[in-house]
Amino acid sequence: MSYGYTARLIQKNKEASDRSLGVKLGRLCIKHDLSVSEVANTLGVSRQAVYNWFTGVNTPKPPLTDLIEELISEL
């Protein structure tokens, strides 16, 4: 497991649609050992919001999508 991510979260991320920007972000964060807390602090959102994006429960809304795309390009 990466950076304290549970097997359940990793599995939900794998099962979620990779068309979602939040799911893509989750896969990269898991791969590169970037914590949910770091992502939440960088984007100014709650950790729960980030978990929901990672698992495809919710999708990030503009203007956060631009910040997320920038973060993804840096990973």
At which residue positions do the language-model features occur?
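Residues in the recognition helix of alpha-helical DNA-binding motifs
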Residues: 28, 42, 53
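Short alpha-helical "recognition helix" segments of helix-turn-helix
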Residues: 38-40
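A short, Lys/Arg-rich alpha-helix, primarily the initiator
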Residues: 6-31
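Short intrinsically disordered terminal tails
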Residues: 1-5, 73-75
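DNA major-groove recognition helix of helix-turn-helix/homeodomain DNA-binding modules
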Residues: 62-75
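Non-catalytic, surface-exposed connector residues within folded enzymatic/regulatory domains
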Residues: 19, 61-62
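Recognition helix of helix-turn-helix/homeodomain-like DNA-binding domains
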Residues: 45-59
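Short coil turns linking two alpha-helices in DNA-binding domains
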Residues: 35, 46-49, 64
